[in-house]
């Protein structure tokens, strides 16, 4: 049985199989025990990356007839595997699915380092019937070589709460791609990049408007309040702050691009490779985005 969805499921994993065998042996010996299902928590090594999952994915929820932003919500973040100012940190992409009551449906993580650790933590919370609010309060071991003061798991909880309370709305990279430059929705949307100039020169979405976050309040008149504004930065913290500024100044349709430029580039790596010849050898990262996310 699927522990999350309470539906029949076949999940051929060694861990659940061994636990079932133990329960079977206990019952044969006269000890009454029950198996309460599996969440399908698993991990795989894919060249230099690790991919880990637990619970249901979005494809499964849709197949059950569930509707996004009604029956379930999703959050996607790009974080550092540990504090960005400590050498060796890598980008970790994480996605989580949850209900309007904060119930956790599942999560996925991909990155060179730290994916298995975070999924194990989320799986433990899910097994205890925890919610996004438990992720917010989760206290994990912290030191710069190992994590950030706000761990990526905490950031998932913070961002999920922001969604449920209406502080932020997101647009996915896939939804951006569906809007071709000639389409009516694209004409009615502004992609606002709030990173610094050197970051914008390194790589940006074609057709996007560049206004650094620090200059946004003084340049609001350059943006059309009647258009949807999709805000993007490196990982999300500056885009979230920019979105709040816009919303507080009368912009009614504001979205933050999920995962930021870091995730967008991972989905458009061929476009990024074409521009490598114009990228300086060293591009300093912005301290605002190091080891942080939306909060």
State the predicted function of each range:
Residues 1, 81-83, 238-239, 264:
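Flexible loop/turn segments at secondary-structure boundaries
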Residues 65-69, 129, 250, 268:
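Glycine-centered loop/turn motif at secondary-structure junctions
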């Amino acid at each position: 049985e699927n522990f999350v969805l309470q539906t029949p499921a076949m999940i051929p994993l060694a861990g659940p199989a061994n636990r079932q065998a133990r329960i079977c042996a206990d019952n044969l010996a006269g000890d009454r025990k029950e198996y309460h299902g599996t969440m399908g928590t698993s991990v795989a090594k894919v060249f230099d990356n690790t991919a880990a999952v637990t619970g249901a994915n979005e494809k499964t929820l849709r197949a059950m007839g569930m509707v996004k932003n009604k029956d379930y919500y999703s959050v996607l973040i790009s974080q550092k595997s540990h504090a960005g100012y400590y050498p060796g940190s890598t980008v970790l992409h994480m996605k989580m699915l949850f209900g309007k009551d904060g119930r956790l449906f599942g999560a996925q993580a991909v990155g060179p380092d730290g994916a298995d650790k975070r999924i194990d933590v989320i799986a433990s919370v899910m097994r205890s019937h925890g919610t996004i609010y438990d992720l917010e309060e989760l206290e994990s071991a912290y030191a710069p070589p190992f994590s950030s003061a706000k761990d990526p798991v905490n950031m998932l909880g913070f961002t999920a709460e922001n969604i449920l309370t209406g502080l932020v709305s997101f647009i996915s990279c896939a939804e951006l791609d569906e809007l071709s430059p000639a389409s009516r929705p694209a004409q009615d949307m502004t992609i606002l990049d709030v990173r610094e100039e050197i970051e914008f020169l390194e790589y940006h979405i074609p057709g996007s408007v560049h206004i650094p976050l620090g200059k946004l309040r003084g340049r609001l008149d350059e943006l059309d309040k009647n258009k949807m504004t999709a805000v993007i930065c490196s990982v999300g913290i500056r885009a979230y702050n920019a979105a709040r500024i816009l919303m507080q100044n009368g912009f009614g349709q504001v979205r933050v691009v999920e995962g930021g430029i870091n995730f967008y580039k991972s989905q458009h790596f061929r476009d990024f490779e074409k521009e490598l010849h114009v990228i300086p050898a060293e591009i300093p990262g912005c301290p605002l985005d190091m080891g942080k996310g939306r909060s």
